[in-house]
Amino acid sequence: MAGHSKFKNIQYRKGAQDKKRAKIFTKLIREIVTAAKTGSSNNPENNPRLRNALTAARSQNLPKERIDKAINSANDASNTENYMEIRYEGYAPSGIAIIVEALTDNKNRTAAEVRSSFTKYGGSLGETGSVNYLFKHCGVIQYLSNIVSSENILEAVMEVDVDDITSDDTIHTIYTDIENFSKVLEFLTGKYGIPEDSYIGWIPLNTIIIDDKEKAEKLLKLVEVLEESDDVQRVFSNYELSDDVYAIIQGA
């Protein structure tokens, strides 16, 4: 797998996300409610998806009272709000593949918003399945290198079933198959605490290097606009910024 061995794409986007904490909380709450409603139990001990959602919420410092309120809302029989899980796929400029995962209570609204964003920034929305063959669907768990050493991570993953691990000076990324994700996440959380990030997502099999500043800015704007939608949970793509372009954009 490629694209997530370097932290700079993630680091750039995290800076933007930090300015939108309220939107992040909205997405986390929506996932908690959906996980509690659609899982086999609203008890995280018996509901892996809810357990994973709670870990993600805590990694983003979602207040406990808001977590509890979300679970109570899911348990409330009078709450008829239901979210549909929808995946959108398409291409951004420069042939970059994009996968958008959404939780929405109005699929027509969300489809229109996503399509409009692709069109506005020079991309094209395709059919579901049009680009997912360029990615691997798997679990991802990330720890900062200043929190856990490479030696400790390598030692830990010997005890559980993981697909791959990449490390650099900034971050360790552990990849798992979907079936083992919850088990590995629970094991690592017990050993090293809540990770920097954890999710089931789409990781590019290969990446396309963006070495032009204008192309990079247009691509990043599309990703940013997509992520700004309350309905969109995550955006995945197969681009990688070159070192020079990354440095220019960070310094802008």
Curated annotation (Swiss-Prot):
Gene Ontology biological-process annotations: regulation of DNA-templated transcription
Superkingdom of origin organism: Bacteria
PANTHER family cross-referenced by the UniProt entry: PTHR12532:SF11, TRANSLATIONAL ACTIVATOR OF CYTOCHROME C OXIDASE 1 (PTHR12532)
Location(s) in or outside the cell: Cytoplasm
Keyword entries, A-Z: Cytoplasm, DNA-binding, Transcription, Transcription regulation
HAMAP family registered for this protein in UniProt: Transcrip_reg_TACO1
One of the record's GO molecular function terms: DNA binding
Coiled-coil region(s): none
Family: Belongs to the TACO1 family.
GO CC list: cytoplasm
Entry protein name: Probable transcriptional regulatory protein A1E_02520
Pfam family, one: Transcrip_reg
